[in-house]
Amino acid sequence: MARGPRYKVPFRRRREGLTNYRKRRKLLLSKKPRLVVRKTNKHIIAQVVVAKPQGDVTIVGIDTRALAKFGWKGDENNTPAAYLLGLIVGYKARIRGVKEAVLDIGLHRPVAGSRVFAVLKGALDAGLEIPHGEEIIPSDDRISGKHIAEYAEKLKKENPELYKTRFSRYLQRGLAPEELPTHFEEVKKKIIEYYEGKLAKAIAQ
């Protein structure tokens, strides 16, 4: 263990790999709400958070399990699900009066085209203003799950048994993975129609 008068013990959350305090300070100095995106092994979580003197206050918070409400049959931790989550959290934030935010991905590596940036794209499409570079946004094909559908179609022809095993959860839910892009567009349309109606009512009040 390092010792000596110049050695500084890191904050506990930094030691445990939970918080990057330098990045957090920069986000807080913006004085804007934060779109906080986190991943688990099974789900993706998105929150819009405002910093207050007494601590962070969550304006809206949701995870990909909420997609079932709109009939989502795909996995809850892939790129299409991440986008749909961002779409929902963006609309919910706007309904609560939030117009802009800054992205907070915590300790996740900022890899262009990754799921955290799919959440960002969904929130942008819902109308939230969030500073970003276009190069980090996943392609439309990845967002719709076309890459998954193409892989599934190829696997189905080459190895039907492995196809059934690898996509067993899709098939159990009644979704052929080759149809994922079409299913994605159907669920996206439902989300937009639902929240555009709620947003119109919120603005009219």
From Swiss-Prot:
GO cellular component, one term: cytosolic large ribosomal subunit
One annotated GO molecular function: structural constituent of ribosome
Keywords, in A-Z order: Ribonucleoprotein, Ribosomal protein, RNA-binding, rRNA-binding
Entry-linked InterPro entries: Rbsml_uL18_euk
Listed SUPFAM superfamilies: Translational machinery components
One Gene Ontology biological process: translation
Function text: This is one of the proteins that bind and probably mediate the attachment of the 5S RNA into the large ribosomal subunit, where it forms part of the central protuberance.
Family from the record: Belongs to the universal ribosomal protein uL18 family.
NCBIfam families cross-referenced by the UniProt entry: PRK08569.1 (NF006342)
Assembly description: Part of the 50S ribosomal subunit. Contacts the 5S and 23S rRNAs.
Protein name in UniProt: Large ribosomal subunit protein uL18
Lineage: Archaea, Thermoproteota, Thermoprotei, Thermoproteales, Thermoproteaceae
